[in-house]
């Protein structure tokens, strides 16, 4: 495995959609009359010289994103982009976590109470914020120190500069709760080397900071203990020049490389199995390998896959495969269709069932519907990718400002 220089830009397999030349618990968003301060406290603002920082500050929920948090982030980033006094922006988390994803417990209760419109509004605003990040006109930095799961990746990986640390843990475990990797995940996972994206999406396998550097998800690596030095240095900058910001981030580099146990050393096996056409073929090939050679990695991987929702596995594989040939806005559009179909229980209630089993009752015995891969039909999967207008004549497609913020492929 090739060694990499921490805090130096790697050659990025992720060609993020942007319009600049440098490569670079749920509720609706209501009026906040009673508790504006509470919502503001969940996303703090820090200003230094010519920069602004958004700090996720919901540590009791591991900085899980609520609807008000997403709304505040979107408003802040929009205003900062328009403010000529601000040269670049930064996002980080308080405590030991960057962002553990969406606040799915509140979503679970909201759906069960029949408030699906709240859920739809959350996803709409979340995906619009991801698109804003991916087309941002100013340099933006994400410091992914600590747990970075689910849409925590979606709100950070579009950034021009993506800093991982020795405390970073990235994972997309959505299939384990009957959902799918979203918030742009079908874009950035599909652009990882080989079929690594399919593997991460179907198993929920974790990556550490060094592995994120090695595969291109992160642009810089920094020891957690050195973050204050980096933040102090970039906080003094008065420029919007990405090259200057790059040099400042690169000041505290170390030589790092994935250790011998890293899953990245199994990329040939990953490509061999996860490059197959269907989930059934992936499982069958790995079962044959495990039986013939007693391959422990195959056994562990099979266990991870078989714990997931069969429907989610098939939806997720198709989502990643389609995302490989789509722009960011197209990925977000098809992810929005999947999410809305999931929370509306049009085909299945696996999302709520997965949350119940893992986070509510904690019996870890979800009753998936359908219960087996062979029971998941093509029509079921296709329903999740069908425009809303073709299902119920509604006009509930995700509307992104592509005319004003046109992406490139």
Swiss-Prot record:
It is found in: Mitochondrion. Pfam families: ECH_2. Its main location: mitochondrion. Residues 1-26 form a transit peptide. One of its GO terms (molecular function) is 3-hydroxyisobutyryl-CoA hydrolase activity. It is an enzyme of class 3 (hydrolase). Gene3D superfamilies: 2-enoyl-CoA Hydratase, Chain A, domain 1. The keyword Cell membrane does not apply. GO terms for cellular component: mitochondrion; ribonucleoprotein complex; ribosome. Residues 388-409 are annotated as: Disordered. The keyword Ribonucleoprotein applies. Keywords: Hydrolase, Mitochondrion, Ribonucleoprotein, Ribosomal protein, Transit peptide. Its EC number is 3.1.2.-. Belongs to the enoyl-CoA hydratase/isomerase family. Mitochondrion-specific ribosomal protein mS47 subfamily. Component of the mitochondrial ribosome small subunit. NCBIfam families: PRK05617.1. This is Small ribosomal subunit protein mS47.
